[in-house]
């Protein structure tokens, strides 16, 4: 089995096993959250990402649409409430609370908070690569 590869992780110097990972996904539209939700459910909540940490983060790069709509779609797809981050409610970020499926024999934290940040890129046009 290959170790997980996060997009970005902050590592605790005292114990390199402990890291706070961030996973990033491009969202073409606010409703295109399947891959985003897949990483939350299958990487973070199954302890593949951040097994020794009680939190992690997802970053969404939204190509078109509103961040508030993307956050709403994420909440619906994950089947949970997204809470405002105290002191930062005007920003397009929220967090969700989960109970993880900890593998038998492991002492990983079962309670997990996932932070969600949506960055809007209005008017961005993505280039398409020709396969000719």
Could you say what each language-model-derived stretch is?
Residues 1-16:
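Active-site metal-binding core of divalent-cation-utilizing nuclease and nuclease-like domains
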Residues 60-66:
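Short beta-alpha junction loops
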Residues 37-43:
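Well-ordered, non-membrane alpha-helical segments in soluble/globular domains
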Residues 8-10, 20-28, 44:
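Conserved catalytic cores of phosphodiester-cleaving nucleases, focusing on short active-site segments
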Residues 1-2, 33-37:
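Phosphate/oxyanion-binding active-site loops and adjacent basic polyanion-contact surfaces
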Residues 4, 45-47:
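Alpha-helical scaffolding within the catalytic cores
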Residues 30-34, 47-55, 68-132:
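C-terminal tail/extension regions appended to the core domain(s) of diverse proteins
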């Amino acid at each position: 089995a290959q170790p997980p590869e996060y997009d970005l992780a902050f590592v605790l110097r005292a114990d390199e096993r402990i890291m706070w990972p961030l996973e990033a996904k491009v969202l073409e539209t606010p409703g295109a959250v399947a891959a985003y939700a897949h990483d939350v459910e299958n990487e973070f909540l199954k302890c593949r990402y951040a097994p020794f940490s009680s939190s992690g983060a997802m970053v969404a790069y939204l190509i078109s649409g509103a961040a508030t709509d993307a956050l709403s779609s994420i909440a619906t797809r994950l089947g949970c409430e997204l809470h405002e981050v105290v002191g930062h409610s005007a920003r397009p970020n929220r967090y969700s609370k989960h109970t993880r499926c900890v593998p038998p024999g492991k002492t990983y934290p079962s309670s997990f908070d996932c932070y969600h940040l949506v960055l809007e890129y209005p008017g961005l046009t993505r280039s398409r690569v020709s396969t000719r």
